[in-house]
């Protein structure tokens, strides 16, 4: 699924790459840029955290005219006046005008590196509104953002993830050459798909993906390889022999009311008392006697 997301970015989509201090997601961000350039799309990068040399390292130089890097590093707040685009300018109006000034032939791909710096200096609601306006404005085809989830409250992370159409969460593994990516994709029909995959990023921003084996498949293989009888090591026997089964069936249970006991209780005995009753004309007689079914 990870390769499908990179190779076929849908119009109006918002791809969110979620990482932490344990595993960086900028490698997948570079792969997204590389895939968009190979699709002959204009890419605008708002670089607040990393220099252009680091973000664009390994990209094909033949696509240099399609890549527009708007420098926000190392002065993202514009205190020294050395940035071409600052965090304060992160609004749908400023970004739309920035893209239109480059006169693209078609809708462009917007890359934000990273949304964490923007969220630290803007109201999260305003940031989400700006992202939603950019998705529907027609100038931006796809938004790709990097978010450091361990720098924000879970509520803020949840709001941004809810806005995204695809969320890629990266985490480390025991193997230093690979990391694991959990891709959650929500289609326009509302269907949600999720898949975990191992991935690695080469120096030329090429993504290699390997499917992660499912947990229940491994459990089934272990059960098939070594099936253990749970009653093999018990100190008592759970099974009855044929003789024991016949003896069990002959035992009269105390709570069973047999026909012999019933007849003995209903048979009158000498010297027993009787109740003689003659109904009176004023007696209330109910034809539907609720006790009529009692055998007394």
From Swiss-Prot:
Biological process per Gene Ontology, one example term: positive regulation of cell migration
Which stretches does the entry tag as region Disordered? 203-232, 264-296
From the Swiss-Prot or TrEMBL record, state where the protein is found. Answer: Nucleus; Cytoplasm
Does Amino-acid biosynthesis appear among the keywords? no
**Associated pathway:** tRNA modification; 5-methoxycarbonylmethyl-2-thiouridine-tRNA biosynthesis
Basic and acidic residues composition bias: residue spans:
214-224
Q: Where is the composition biased (Acidic residues)?
A: 280-296
List the PANTHER family. ELONGATOR COMPLEX PROTEIN 5
Kindly provide the name given to this protein in its UniProt entry: Elongator complex protein 5
Gene behind the chain: elp5
């Amino acid at each position: 699924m990870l390769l499908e997301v990179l190779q076929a970015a849908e119009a109006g989509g918002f791809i969110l790459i979620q990482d932490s201090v344990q595993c960086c997601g900028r490698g997948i961000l570079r792969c997204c840029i590389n895939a968009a350039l190979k699709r002959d799309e204009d890419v605008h990068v708002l670089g607040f955290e990393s220099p252009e040399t680091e973000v664009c390292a390994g990209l094909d130089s033949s696509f240099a005219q399609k890549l527009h890097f708007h420098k926000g590093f190392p002065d993202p707040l514009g205190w020294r006046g050395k940035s071409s685009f600052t965090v304060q300018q992160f609004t749908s109006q400023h970004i739309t005008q920035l893209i239109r000034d480059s006169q693209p032939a078609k809708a462009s791909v917007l890359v934000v590196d990273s949304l964490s710096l923007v969220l630290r200096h803007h109201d999260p609601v305003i940031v989400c509104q700006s992202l939603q306006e950019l998705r529907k404005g027609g100038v931006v085809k796809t938004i790709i953002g990097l978010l450091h989830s361990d720098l924000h409250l879970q509520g803020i992370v949840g709001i941004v993830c809810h806005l995204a159409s695809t969320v890629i969460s990266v985490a480390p593994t025991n193997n230093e050459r690979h990391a694991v990516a959990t891709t959650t994709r929500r289609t326009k029909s509302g269907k949600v798909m999720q898949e975990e995959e191992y991935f690695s990023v080469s120096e030329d921003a090429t993504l290699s993906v390997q499917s992660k084996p499912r947990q229940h498949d491994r459990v089934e293989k272990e059960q098939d390889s070594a099936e253990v009888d749970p009653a093999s090591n018990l100190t008592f026997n759970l099974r009855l022999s044929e003789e024991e089964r016949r003896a069990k069936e002959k035992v009269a249970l105390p709570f069973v009311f047999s026909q012999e006991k019933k007849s003995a209780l209903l048979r009158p005995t000498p010297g027993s008392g009787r109740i003689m009753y003659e109904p009176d004309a004023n007696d209330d007689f109910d034809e539907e006697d609720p006790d009529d079914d009692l055998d007394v």
